Every structure is written in structure tokens, then in C-alpha cells.
Amino acid sequence: MYQRLLKSLNHLNPRAWDFVQLTRMDKPIGIYLLLWPTLWALWIAGKGSPSLINIVIFVLGVVLTRAGGCVINDWADRKVDGHVKRTEQRPLVSGKISSKEALVFFAVLMGISFLLVLLTNATTILLSLGGLALAASYPFMKRYTYYPQVVLGAAFSWGMPMAFTAETGDLPATAWLLYIANLLWTVGYDTYYAMTDRDDDLKIGVKSTAILFGDADRVIILTLQGLSLVCLLLAGARFELGGWFHLGLLAAAGCFAWEFWYTRDKDRMKCFKAFLHNHWAGLAIFVGIVADYAFR
């Protein structure tokens, strides 16, 4: 339903549809993968009852910053996306949106996001500057390092410490266990994503963990996912989370095991579906956290 409504813009206002595609609003998977961990942290920080204003701020912030991240990513990759099958029709490549328009749109999205952060507190505002730096630098990392997925993981996890400081005014050391857990998980699922482009990336000289890991890619992904669950288990113990949370982790572990089995032949589309499937793992963990606080 959501995607059908958005696609109707293509007929009503093709220009607006170009910007929908630029921000990937027609592909909300990135919103989910960024949203669930942010909500994990917000619910834990609020001990099951985070403030409504913070929920609104962080949900809107996730949507806006993810959109901005897509814009700056496409701007950075505008000269190479035409050589990759999956990205050759993006608006900046086709010329439907100019480089200048993309940069202005990125600035607008980040400006609105910053206005939302101003509704929190000084510590959260300062932390947001680090998140902006990570989001803006990530698209350029693939040119210089085989670890762009690590930078993405750092950026995708940055909302978690911000959620703690916004909700409590404090940042306990254990919150960084959640941060590390999400970073490891992100590197894992984004490696599946990078595996879909690996052949094209090798031709044009773009680097990724999928290339770095080589034949060990799936084993390393599963290891990263397992370490992520260990970090979450340790953090859960410190935050006194119990059975429902553990059930959420068990469901996530089942998701990871299925992805490992499903991608056994490393088919490009299967790797992409495994990437998409991680949304369910994040949701399962969030439901476990919510239920654990709700049924006490």
C-alpha cells in the first residue's frame, strides 16, 4: 500500500518521484534497519516507557537522516553508479536531478534533522555532530578502504547513544555494548548487500568487506552476527532484561541461521534477500525488549 501510494507520484508528479527515488523512500528497508536499534536503545533508556516527544523526534530523525544519507551517497557515487547494474538508473546518473540540487536537498534534510535534535539537550546536540560526520564520510570510504561497512555500522549505531542522552541525560558505559552489537550486526548485513555488487565493484575498483572477506564471507558474516548477539546478551544482563528479551534474541539467531543457509550458493539475488531479511531480526529484538518491560 505504502509503495503503491508513492509510485502514484510517478504519474501525478514525475519530478517529485525523482526525489523519492533519490532518498529511497520507495525502499524503506534502510529506515527499518536504522530504526529498530534506535528504538532498542530508547526503550531501554526509558525502562520501557520512553517519552512520547523522544519517540517522535527519533522516528522522524531516522527517516530524515536515512534520506539524507542516501542523497549524499548517490552524490558521492554519481560517477561510478552508471557502471553498476543495480544503480545505473539512479536519478543523479540519469541526469534527472543535478549535483547541485542533490547537495541543496541534503543540506535541507540535515537542517530539519538538526532542528529536531535541538528539542533534546546539549549532550545529544553535541553527539549529533559526530553522527553527521560519520554519515557524510561513509560514501567516500569505499574508495580508500575495504572497511566502508564498519563506517556505516558506526553511523547506523550513532542514534543509540543519542537516545540514551536524550532520554536520561546520561550515557552509561553499558550503552556502548549496544552500540558495538549494532555495529557488528550492520557490518554483517551490509556485507550481504555488498556481495550483490561484488563483481561490478571489482571491475571499477570499489572496495568492500565482501571483497575483503572473499570465500570466507558467509562464515565471517555469521560470526559477526553471533558476536552481536553475545554483546546484546551481556548488555541485557546489565540492564536486567529477562525472558522475553532472550526470546527476541533467539528469534534473531534463527533469522541469522536461515540467512546463512539461504545464501549457501552465494547467488546475487539471494544475498540481497538475506540483507532485506535482517529487518526481521531487528524487529524481533525490539519486540522482545518491549514485551520484557510490558509484562513485568
Swiss-Prot record:
Keyword Cell inner membrane belongs to the record: yes
Keywords: Cell inner membrane, Cell membrane, Magnesium, Membrane, Transferase, Transmembrane, Transmembrane helix, Ubiquinone biosynthesis
Catalytic reaction equation(s): all-trans-octaprenyl diphosphate + 4-hydroxybenzoate = 4-hydroxy-3-(all-trans-octaprenyl)benzoate + diphosphate
One of the protein's GO biological processes: ubiquinone biosynthetic process
Top-rank lineage group of the source organism: Bacteria
Major location (coarse): membrane
The protein's name in its UniProt record: 4-hydroxybenzoate octaprenyltransferase
Organism: Pseudomonas fluorescens (strain SBW25)
